[in-house]
Amino acid sequence: MREFLIIATLGALATTNASATSSWLDSHDVQQQLAAGQVVVRGAMDGRAMAARVDAAVKVHADRDAIWGVLKDCDHAPSFIPGLKRCQRVASAPDGSWEVIAHDVKYSWFMPTIHSVFRADYQRPSRIDFHRIGGDLKDEQGSWLLEPLPDGSGTIVEYQMQINPGFWIPQAIVHRSLRKELPEALAALRIRVESLQAARR
């Protein structure tokens, strides 16, 4: 059974650009973990600002187009993404270069459902950037990056997010999200993509 490996770094929240953030994936240890099928996560929290940054990655045995289709499948996303109760397209560009999407997410049984509205900008098939434009959270922004492996064995899917809910959240909830919920979401994405690809063969 594939294991989840969590790399959690608690300290000051650092804001870096995407290329600098992705350099963490070049680590030999991280590369070994990805090759072994692990979901790798690292996070940083700023308790004073109630903000957090998270980077995560997983290897998917599929090409970028297959992964892209699942990432954009709003209609079916709640059926395989843990905690996501609703995904709705609110608006979209005529040329398909961006969409406005609304999410309702239940992070924990004793917390209210969080409503989030964000704009997603698409650079097919390699990148999706998103940022908050409405909803309950004070700030939310991040990216999905799809990098094909040189040997053609699959794609590294990297997820980056900076979030500031604007209200206090118990650190136990944040730790649980890093330790359990985010790896489950990326594993669910991998399972969905690989199962759809297998069904087409």
Question: Over which residues does each language-model region extend?
Answer:
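Sec-dependent N-terminal signal peptides
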Residues: 4-13
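N-terminal signal peptide c-region/cleavage motif recognized by signal peptidases
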Residues: 15-17
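Hydrophobic-ligand binding "helix-grip"
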Residues: 21-24, 28-35, 107-154, 162, ...
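Second-shell loop/turn segments in exported
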Residues: 53-58, 64-66, 106, 132, ...
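Intrinsic-disorder/low-complexity, polar/charged segments enriched in Ser/Thr/Lys/Arg/Asp/Glu/Gln
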Residues: 51-59, 98-100, 115, 127, ...
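A conserved amphipathic terminal alpha-helix motif
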Residues: 162-201
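Hydrophobic ligand-binding cavity/cleft-lining segments
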Residues: 20-93, 184, 188-191
